[in-house]
Amino acid sequence: MTQYTPMIQQYLKVKADYQDAFLFFRLGDFYEMFFEDAVKAAHELEITLTSRDGGSSERIPMCGVPYHAAKNYIEQLVEKGYKVAVCEQVEDPKTAKGVVRREVVQLITPGTMMEGRTIDEKENNFLAALTHFEDGSYALACNDLTTGQNTVTLLTGSVEDILLEVYATGSKEIVVDSSFSKDELNKLTETLKMTISYEDATAIPEGLEHLVKNVSQAKLIKAVGRLFNYVIRTQKRSLDHLQPVEIYYTNQFMKIDVHSKRNLELTETLRTKEKTGSLLWLLDKTKTAMGGRMLKQWMERPLIQKERIEERLEMVETFVNDYFLREDLKEKLKEVYDLERLAGKVAFGNVNARDLLQLRRSLLQVPAILEAISLLDNAYAARLIQGADPCESLTELLGRSIQENPPLSIKDGDIIKDGYNDKLDQYRYVSKNGKTWIAELEKRERDITGIKSLKIGYNRIFGYYIEVTKANLGALPEGRYERKQTLANAERFITDELKEKETLILEAEEKIVQLEYDLFTALREEVKVFIPKLQHLAKVISELDVLQSFATVSEEEQFVKPVLTTKREIFIKDGRHPVVEKVLNGKLYVPNDCIMPENMDVFLITGPNMSGKSTYMRQLALVTVMSQIGCFVPATEAVLPVFDQIFTRIGAADDLISGQSTFMVEMLEAKNAIANASERSLILFDEIGRGTSTYDGMALAQAIIEHIHDQIGAKTLFSTHYHELTVLEESLDQLKNVHVSAIEENGKVVFLHKIQDGAADKSYGIHVAQLAELPDSLIARAKEVLAQLEGQEEIIIPKRVEVKMQEQEVIPEPVVVKEAPVEIEETKVENEEESQLSFFGGEQSPKKQDKPVLDTKETAVLAQIKKIDLLDMTPLEAMNELYRLQKKLKKG
């Protein structure tokens, strides 16, 4: 390093502590980057890469951005998942001896951004910290630096369960210890696209102990400690707005795995990854940013406590029934700014005068809001506003201190009102009267000299001056003015009197700006005292905002209040998919019932492609989610149980994820449901098994249906194109066939989108191909092939029957169903015995044989068949074994 200049040595020393971040190194009016940082930043920011001499034999790569535009460039890098360390000059270059002292004043990361375009006003910006313990458990702590919110929970289960909870937080960055499993880190980065950071310190930092008073479990404290240490190390400033840590338990909320949340498009659409078109988009009628954030949190974690859900529903009902109350509340909420983030800016020290005006305007609405809610005859409402302080003294303080239209910068003056501070008023009097004196002097000098164009001006370099055009210089009295500056067309002069007044005026103006800054920072400290009260108010207002949002959308869309039942039954009359109905924008939407009494667990849904099977399934899931967040639901009547989990396997049909799924993903998602679902869960399986061959797929579908029916008992909607499976209704007493109806008119299919009892009789796949405008010749050929296939052999699928036999309850029994061809031939026997099927594809016996003659290979295969324990095999395993043996026989 000694070969480099002192400044580059200083840069390298600072950079050594921030290897995983871009170092914005302040040099005068620019932030410069060097070496690898410069090369990478020039590429990412599309700025010019240059070089400079740094004392070594080779020039050093360099790029830079102006300090006044740095915010935009920093946001670009953070938006891409990078970190930026901001290194400032911390001493005056004029007084510095040698290299100016520089220090990193802040590390800006995806999880610690306070403001900018990457921060959505209606979304939290959580930073997560994950701690893994030897017993296999994890503790997850989260902080939103913009609002001060802190949460922590203890997690057990698979890595997938952990990923689900991290995903639910929406965190963009996660902090782990340096020994964290690389495999698990890969899952975090690949599955959730998160920035990884490291922090090994886990003790609660000094001064923050009060935030964990209600946390007693050592594991949770360790996770919070890791989180707080990272925040302090990166931010290097006041964190007075951090709120007490809230403990939550995942078993308090409905579980919806990552894939199911995406499939259901709860908060964003699958295709665009945007809010528009999602359930959140439909339900968000909130008037405040903090209300919007709370709504999203509620949607990420629906409740499972019946009493809490009903409390919310009752409040929504109150707002639905009282139009004037609701509209008055909405008008007040429109004037409420983001109290949580304003409090955060106050604590961070980056609040400006306009922010404080927003705070005052917000507080002016609070008394009326609290008064209106206090008049409601509702225990939940009374409990909600209990302890809420309207902060009237703060409103009064801000009202008499801040100008009505202050500048953005707090260093330009014109912030503080007249009458707030006596000394400031005195300085302003001097400044104002001094300027009046200047105007009078200009008029007097014009009269004395007779020069009408004479003027008195000011600039920062020369101060005040008298300017006379060269054409009028001859009219000046000799010795009256002292020459100051010569211009192309004029001369500038000063007088002793003008210099004396200038000193008084400039001193006053300089003191005004400094005093206003000092008064503002003191005011900011006074506001800090109110931060806890402001944060409590923010929670109250946010919750009221979400509840009125539910009421507003419920009335607009004609939703109905659901009745929650402790029974395992679903009764939905005229249910609708809320988002699809909204997108149709007034066009006729066909509602459908979903009636599943306690003794009915599985709906096996068949019907044409594009007929609405997937929409019907999602409809039930969304109705369930809406009910359990406390919103009315799209139906004319709804009685629902409280579900503990929702599992979906909804594939590429109906233009949702369009071919992006694989058979392995399908099986993994099915496995997740089968392994974790309870009888209180909701399972939605759409076309399970279509990602593999017909027989494998059919076998898997049947086995999964039987397992859910016999072993789990969860309410399940299972759609399929395997019409052969509809015979399961005969053997599974809690399964019912339903189908989506369609009719043919003049050779064309018309989808009715109506769910009806019974199985569908055909798929209409070729009609869908016609709708897609495939060539007529291709359609005609498809019809020919279909006619040939429909005239061929029958498939025999295993049907489960209840037969007691050596303590076994299930044995396979053939059930004949019409379907596509199978490569088996029938062997006819010329006696009274029933005809048997030759699974080996052998020729028909021309006559009766007392004992078949088998060759060596056939004898070996027969021996293997005799050893097979069919009762110990799944349908898929049996079919695979049969296929293997058949191949063995066919080999010549």
Swiss-Prot record:
Q: Which residues form a coiled coil?
A: none
* Protein name per Swiss-Prot or TrEMBL: DNA mismatch repair protein MutS
Family stated for the protein in its record: Belongs to the DNA mismatch repair MutS family.
Which UniProt keywords are listed? Answer: ATP-binding, DNA damage, DNA repair, DNA-binding, Nucleotide-binding
Q: Ranges of Basic and acidic residues compositional bias?
A: 845-854
Native species:
Bacillus cereus (strain Q1)
One molecular function GO term is: ATP binding
| Gene3D superfamilies on file | 1.10.1420.10, DNA repair protein MutS, domain I (3.40.1170.10), MutS, connector domain (3.30.420.110), P-loop containing nucleotide triphosphate hydrolases (3.40.50.300)
Using the record, list the residue span of the signal peptide; answer none if the entry has no such feature: none
